[in-house]
Amino acid sequence: MQKAGRLLGGWTQAWMSVRMASSGLTRRNPLSNKVALVTASTDGIGFAIARRLAEDGAHVVVSSRKQQNVDRAVATLQGEGLSVTGIVCHVGKAEDREKLITTALKRHQGIDILVSNAAVNPFFGNLMDVTEEVWDKVLSINVTATAMMIKAVVPEMEKRGGGSVVIVGSVAGFTRFPSLGPYNVSKTALLGLTKNFAAELAPKNIRVNCLAPGLIKTRFSSVLWEEKAREDFIKEAMQIRRLGKPEDCAGIVSFLCSEDASYINGETVVVGGGTPSRL
């Protein structure tokens, strides 16, 4: 009888802990003292991810191509009491990638997390009208720069005993967005990049996963939803009848970077409101 009572008491205590955690009565910092680099992180999805990682205890280095955007993002997040610094970084330039890493090392003596979010989409139209210049730009920034950024941070993660990389892809890698051919192709390539890096880096205790957002309401995606009729049509085609918010992506990334996801590697998590997501 006493044994049953102790068992029941243990279950009750565990259940109360779950209840308190889910209701926000307790909050741990799953990324406490981790150092995170987030590219293209002064607006939209990248900014929401940077904020969430910092809220969960990480020291975050944000970046953007424009100094004014970096200054604004850093001021906002530091104003919220978060550990955030920033630097200008054009991910397509090797010298800028090096400066981003150097900044993190000087301030925090290491790197544990990379979120590769930078992407471009300079074309809207028929695939047959895409120039070689456009193809080169899209693949260079969206795919090659992502690979080079990962290559650059891996030695620093090894020094820390491991790390976590999250590549921000898109549901467009699975299901084409009309008139965005080169962008769609680049995001499909990131699915393969994730799988290959995940397999190669796992022995180094570095996990690589991918986030595939659906249609998230940001400035970057505005061409797809700025007309109300188009937005309404998109909503009708979705299982969850709304467009996503940047914050819908942020918690998933924080989870993937945490020890709670220590046995997750090479996976793509779709945050798309039920958008079809299979190749």
From Swiss-Prot:
Residues the record lists as Phosphoserine modifications: 221
Residues where NADP(+) binds: 37-61, 187
InterPro entries cross-referenced by the UniProt entry: NAD(P)-bd_dom_sf, Sc_DH/Rdtase_CS, SDR_fam
Record site: Important for the maintenance of the quaternary structure, the catalytic activity and cold stability: 196
EC identifiers of the protein: 1.1.1.184, 1.1.1.300
One protein family per Pfam: adh_short_C2
Active site: 183
CDD domains xref list: CR_SDR_c
Keyword Acetylation tagged: yes
Subcellular location: Peroxisome
A single cellular component GO annotation: peroxisome
Top-level taxon in the UniProt lineage: Eukaryota
Site positions for Responsible for the stereoselective reduction of 3-ketosteroids into 3alpha-hydroxysteroids and benzil into S-benzoin: 177, 180
Known catalytic reactions: a secondary alcohol + NADP(+) = a ketone + NADPH + H(+); 3alpha-hydroxy-5beta-pregnan-20-one + NADP(+) = 5beta-pregnan-3,20-dione + NADPH + H(+); 5beta-dihydrotestosterone + NADPH + H(+) = 5beta-androstane-3alpha,17beta-diol + NADP(+); all-trans-retinol + NADP(+) = all-trans-retinal + NADPH + H(+)
Residues modified as N6-succinyllysine: 93, 217, 228, 235
Principal place of residence: other
Subunit structure, as described in the record: Homotetramer.
Role this protein plays: NADPH-dependent oxidoreductase which catalyzes the reduction of a variety of compounds bearing carbonyl groups including ketosteroids, alpha-dicarbonyl compounds, aldehydes, aromatic ketones and quinones. Reduces all-trans-retinal and 9-cis retinal. Reduces 3-ketosteroids and benzil into 3alpha-hydroxysteroids and S-benzoin, respectively, in contrast to the stereoselectivity of primates DHRS4s which produce 3beta-hydroxysteroids and R-benzoin. In the reverse reaction, catalyzes the NADP-dependent oxidation of 3alpha-hydroxysteroids and alcohol, but with much lower efficiency.
Further comment found in the protein's record: Primate DHRS4s display different stereoselectivity and catalytic efficiency in the oxidoreduction of some substrates as compared to other mammal DHRS4s due to a difference in conserved amino acid residues.
Protein name: Dehydrogenase/reductase SDR family member 4
Species of the source: Mus musculus (Mouse)
Name of the encoding gene: Dhrs4
